[in-house]
Amino acid sequence: MRRLLAAVLTLLPCAVHAETVTFGLDWKAEAEYGGYYQAVATGIYAKHGLDVTVKQGGPQVNHTQLLLAGRLDYNISSNSFLALNFVKENIPFRTVASMFQKDPSVLIAHAGQGNDTFAALKGKPIMISSDTRVGWWNFLKARFGYTDAQIRPYTFNLAPFLSDKTAIQQGFLGSEPFSIKETAHEEPVVMLVADAGFTGYASLIATSDKRIRENPDQVKRFIEASIEGWYSYLNGDPAPGNALIKKENPEMTDALMAYGRESLKKHGILDSGDAAKDGIGAMAAARWAAFYASVRDQGIYPAGLDATKAYTLQFVNQKAGMGK
């Protein structure tokens, strides 16, 4: 009885003093957010004194606006462009970790059409979203000579792609390729934009400068717990996180989540590059500087922008969670 009482008392401080945190995703619950759901389901956030609510996003949800309005404490920024936008627009928020070392964005084509390299797609119609047009599309224009005349609207619906063997569209590594295989029973050509040399980070965690300044301990605990959740999800049993994902997003199947998780692992989306030595979430000032220089030269951002204001290295590169 005494031993049980001692164990309960040991847990009480975390339960009583847990800080409430609201965290927004940039899309619906799926394996690409598995680490966060794993951290909730397995008590990793609770162990760090945090009571975290994960709010999924979607096509009609602008969590960046909710973050700026103070209705979210932390938010997933899809890519490095959003972080630089904060600087350009003088908005006092910044990136505190980059969970994805590689952007999982892909271009997808049908096999047997000669559309199996980025270079081969020059001059051909490609379905992309408005966000992509102002994002990594500019990298492809500079790298491979693509033009805006190639752009066709992408509505996040696979029907146009499936009905046209010459069609090419954007997608995400762990999602659309699987759906195409399941629906059309064909193996599509999948080209990862990061493999073509795109150096932008992806799935970045953003918060306010005010929070960083006034509550750095919470930021540190949130980032460390999120990183631990990712190591647990990738290297351990993902079932707890997957169960929460399915509860949040009933469209998710076990097969799709397994495919998404395996895609993250196979391509080193989280743990390659600097993350291999410094841990998941790693960022490097040199990489940020190089990315800014490239998008500045493409005319996306003005010269003289202080890219160091887009991020802080205060909470990463500390090998948190490695070996767990």
Predicted features by range, described:
Residues 1-4:
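Positively charged n-region of N-terminal signal peptides that target proteins for export
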Residues 13-15:
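N-terminal signal peptide c-region/cleavage motif recognized by signal peptidases
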Residues 19, 85-96, 148, 163-166, ...:
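Ligand-binding "clamshell"
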Residues 40-43, 48-49, 71, 76-79, ...:
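Sec/Tat-exported extracytoplasmic proteins
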Residues 213-298:
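Secondary-structure end/capping motifs
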Residues 285-324:
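Conserved C-terminal helix/tail region of periplasmic/extracytoplasmic solute-binding proteins
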Residues 20-154, 158-163, 167-174, 199:
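Short, glycine-/small- and polar/acidic-enriched structural segments
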